[in-house]
Structure formats: structure tokens, C-alpha cells
């Protein structure tokens, strides 16, 4: 768009429908372009071009279309895409979903202005994710190890304590190694005022805000802002990682609310719906978010992602978790059954998986026994869980002594490894030592997945 076109104000609004506005007689307009809108009473609003074709532009108005009409509304196309001013001073601050300060502090003086859609990374320029990120949560660090540059979602359900777990991870997460800089970028989308107050209070009172940048989009904020929020958060993370050399953990919650906003906007545009009414491009859209995690050759910093989503009706085959699973590198599944038992965090390790766990385990990263002892504990816990079904039919008296030991191990594993205080920050060494202690419940001859050398080195003597 040339300079002349940037000064033209259009009054050719032909239709307003929900958050969308259609402008006729437009030339040289690009998809994603930012639009300045003047309401009939002189107020200023901002929008973004969602569709441009045959001299028609469809614009999503960020602040909604109330008080706008087709005769007096003025529109100016800026020629710019959505950008955010970023700075190292964003650490310790809380912003709304559009990147405006929410904590009463001053506006950020930008060191750079970056396109919120990021820049495509040549796959050849990527380094494989590696090195351990410690969350202080045993069921993540031990069995589903998080690796720098990885993207691993948490699959939750309505009413499960994913918000509590998210703030615990944000508070406790760290990278090991002298001189390594670490930060958390936390973005909440479509949350209630009560949830917003919980997040802000937790970050402030625990001191976690010092190393964090927080973005909060409320349920009553415009749907388009919900689409922008994760992109703004990821752009901030990329700046801290690739410009400032920091290792950044990005926590995005709740991606289900994000996808509902996608569906709302698609319906307003009369698009042909895909599975369960979600737009057909939802897979591509989610990939554009998740694939912004990683390590880049020549850059010290990394971006690691933990997106959190609530599965409608606890259905893991729902399009949102289903498509997410195709893109990401595993999943951490919260269990309603464990939650009913009073276990926190209710992480079910059997359906959970970190596909890159091996990249962050072992000597020099965690400990030499990590992968072997976890394999042994996982197998024993799975067998113990299976025996519970048998006990429900035949009773515990029908079990052999061997089977009883596995049943006892499963109960102990849930009560001492899975169960953890909300303020309990365990090192990986503590987690592994706890597991070795539990393995003493099993007969020595059943420890088939760990070597005699490791048993002699780490297994406590009875």
C-alpha cells in the first residue's frame, strides 16, 4: 500500500454482522492488515482484515461493533500488520490480551516492534530439542521429562486443577546450568474474572512475577483479542529467547477457549464448518502456534511450550486435543479418577507421554539412572493398576504374594510420587530417590529393567 492510500478514509461500510464489518470499493488491501476505525461519535477503534477480495474487505473489529453504523463509520487502512512493541522491561509485568498494561504500570518503551505472527523458520535452521527443564513436579520431571525447545500439552477437563498446576509450574520451573537465564511467558485466554484474580494474586504473592511476563484475556473480551493473545505471548517469548539469549517457557491456557473463538469468527464469516463446527483450517492455525517452540542454530535461547486445554466431556478424541496431539510431542493427561481420590496433581502417567524425554535424561542432564528407573517404575505401576481390576472380581485374598507387592507399589506410587503439595518443589534427584525407595516394595528378582550396577548404587538397603 502506498502513502496516498494510507491517508484515505473510507465511508463505504456496507454491512455489519457481529464483530465483522464489510467495506466495499477497496483496492490494494492485504490479509492481516491493521485498520483504524472512527465511530460516529468520534471514538477510535482498531480492526484487522480477515478477508480481501474483489474490492471488498472483511474486517474484524477488536473492540466490537456496538455503536457502529453503515453511514457514519470511517475506516482507514494502515498498510501494517499487527505488531507488538517488545522489551526486556516486560519481565515482571501483567498485560491484557492485546498487550496493554493491566497492572497499573507505565506503557512499555519498545526496544523493537515485531509482527505477532512471527517469522517462518527454515527447518534446516532448527536444532533438536535437548537439555532438561525442571518443573519441580515429579510426574512431569520423572516420567514425562520436559526438554528445552519441546512442545507438550496438558490435557485436562472441566473442574480439574489445571490452573493450580499451571501456576505451580510457572513458579517452580527452572533450567539447570550456571549462568543460564530463564523466564516464563504466561498467557491466559477466555478466563473468568475469578480465574484472572487467582492468576494475578498467585504470581504476585509467590514472587514468580519477577521472572515472568503475563497476558490475560477475559471471557468477555472480544473474540479477536483471544486470537491475538497467544501470538503476542509467543512473539514476546521469541524476543526474549532469540534476542536476549534466555530460555523461555511459554504456558498457554486455555486453548479450548482459543478454538471456540476461532469457531465464532468462522461462523460470523459464514464459512463452511469442519468437524463439530470448527473451521477446517483449525489444524493449520494450531500448528502456527505450536511450531513456534524450538531451538534455532546460532541462538543461545530456546522457546519451550506447555499449552493447556480442557477436553469437552473429557473426550480425548475431540477435534481440539486430537489435532493438538498430531502436532505436539506428547501429552500430559489429568485424570478425573485420581482427582476424585484427592490426589494432586492428578497426572495419569499411563496415557501421558513425552516423546522427547530421552533427550533430557541421563548423565550430565539429570542422572545416569533416570531412564532405567522410570521404565521400571512405569511397568510396575501399570501392572499394579491392572491388578486392581482383578481384585474387584476375585478379592485380594486370591492374589499371590508377588501380585500383592505390585498392588502395594501402585498405591504407594500414587500416594508418594504422584501426590505432591501445591507448594512442594522437588528436584529431579529427590524424585528419582523417592522412586528407588518405592522399588524396595517389589521382590529383587522383579527389578528386570535396571542393571545390577544401578541397583547396588541407588536401591536403599532394607
From Swiss-Prot:
Subcellular location per the Swiss-Prot or TrEMBL entry: Cell membrane
Membrane topology: Peripheral membrane protein
CDD domains the record matches: ATP-synt_V_A-type_beta_C, ATP-synt_V_A-type_beta_N, V_A-ATPase_B
Recorded GO MF terms: ATP binding; proton-transporting ATP synthase activity, rotational mechanism
Keywords from the named record: ATP synthesis, Cell membrane, Hydrogen ion transport, Ion transport, Membrane, Transport
Superkingdom of the organism of origin: Archaea
SUPFAM superfamilies per UniProt: C-terminal domain of alpha and beta subunits of F1 ATP synthase, P-loop containing nucleoside triphosphate hydrolases
Gene Ontology BP term (one): proton motive force-driven plasma membrane ATP synthesis
GO CC annotation: plasma membrane
HAMAP family xref list: ATP_synth_B_arch
Assembly behavior: Has multiple subunits with at least A(3), B(3), C, D, E, F, H, I and proteolipid K(x).
Role description: Component of the A-type ATP synthase that produces ATP from ADP in the presence of a proton gradient across the membrane. The B chain is a regulatory subunit.
Similarity comment: Belongs to the ATPase alpha/beta chains family.
Protein's name according to its UniProt entry: A-type ATP synthase subunit B
Biological source species: Methanococcus maripaludis (strain C5 / ATCC BAA-1333)
Amino acid at each position: 500500500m502506498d502513502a496516498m492510500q494510507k491517508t484515505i478514509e473510507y465511508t463505504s461500510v456496507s454491512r455489519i454482522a457481529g464483530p465483522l464489518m464489510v467495506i466495499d470499493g477497496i483496492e490494494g488491501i492485504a490479509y492481516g492488515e491493521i485498520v483504524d476505525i472512527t465511530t460516529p461519535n468520534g471514538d477510535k477503534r482498531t480492526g484487522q482484515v480477515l478477508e480481501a477480495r474483489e474490492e471488498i474487505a472483511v474486517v474484524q473489529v477488536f473492540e466490537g461493533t456496538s455503536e457502529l453504523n453503515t453511514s457514519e463509520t470511517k475506516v482507514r487502512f494502515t498498510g501494517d500488520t499487527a505488531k507488538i512493541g517488545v522489551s526486556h522491561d516486560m519481565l515482571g509485568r501483567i498485560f491484557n490480551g492485546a498487550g496493554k498494561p493491566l497492572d497499573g504500570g507505565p506503557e512499555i518503551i519498545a526496544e523493537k516492534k515485531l509482527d505477532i505472527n512471527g517469522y517462518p523458520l527454515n527447518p534446516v535452521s532448527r536444532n533438536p530439542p535437548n537439555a532438561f527443564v525442571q518443573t519441580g513436579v515429579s510426574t512431569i520431571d520423572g516420567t514425562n521429562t520436559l526438554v528445552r525447545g519441546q512442545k507438550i500439552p496438558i490435557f485436562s477437563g472441566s473442574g480439574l486443577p489445571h490452573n493450580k498446576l499451571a501456576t505451580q509450574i510457572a513458579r517452580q520451573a527452572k533450567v539447570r546450568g550456571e549462568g543460564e537465564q530463564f523466564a516464563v511467558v504466561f498467557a491466559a485466554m477466555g478466563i473468568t474474572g475469578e480465574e484472572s484474580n487467582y492468576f494475578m494474586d498467585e504470581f504476585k504473592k509467590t514472587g514468580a512475577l519477577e521472572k515472568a511476563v503475563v497476558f490475560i484475556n477475559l471471557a468477555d473480551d472480544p473474540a479477536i483479542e483471544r486470537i491475538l493473545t497467544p501470538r503476542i505471548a509467543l512473539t514476546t517469548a521469541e524476543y526474549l529467547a532469540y534476542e536476549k539469549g534466555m530460555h523461555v517457557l511459554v504456558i498457554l491456557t486455555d486453548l479450548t477457549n482459543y478454538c471456540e473463538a476461532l469457531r465464532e469468527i468462522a461462523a460470523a464469516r459464514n464459512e463452511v464448518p469442519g468437524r463439530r463446527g470448527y473451521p477446517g483450517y483449525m489444524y493449520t492455525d494450531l500448528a502456527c502456534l505450536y511450531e513456534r517452540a524450538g531451538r534455532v542454530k546460532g541462538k543461545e535461547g530456546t522457546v519451550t511450550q506447555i499449552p493447556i486445554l480442557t477436553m469437552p466431556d473429557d473426550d480425548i478424541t475431540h477435534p481440539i486435543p486430537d489435532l493438538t496431539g498430531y502436532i505436539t510431542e506428547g501429552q500430559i493427561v489429568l485424570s478425573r479418577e485420581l482427582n476424585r481420590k484427592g490426589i494432586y496433581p492428578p497426572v495419569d502417567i499411563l496415557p501421558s507421554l513425552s516423546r522427547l524425554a530421552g533427550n533430557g535424561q541421563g548423565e550430565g542432564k539429570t542422572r545416569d539412572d533416570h531412564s532405567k528407573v522410570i521404565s521400571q517404575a512405569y511397568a510396575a505401576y501399570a501392572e499394579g493398576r491392572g491388578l486392581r481390576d482383578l481384585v474387584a472380581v476375585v478379592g485380594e485374598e486370591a492374589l499371590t504374594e508377588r501380585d500383592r507387592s505390585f498392588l502395594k507399589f501402585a498405591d504407594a506410587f500414587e500416594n508418594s510420587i504422584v501426590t505432591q503439595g501445591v507448594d512442594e518443589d522437588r528436584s529431579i534427584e529427590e524424585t528419582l530417590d523417592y522412586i528407588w525407595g518405592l522399588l524396595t516394595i517389589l521382590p529383587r528378582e522383579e527389578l528386570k529393567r535396571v542393571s545390577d550396577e544401578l541397583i547396588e548404587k541407588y536401591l536403599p538397603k532394607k
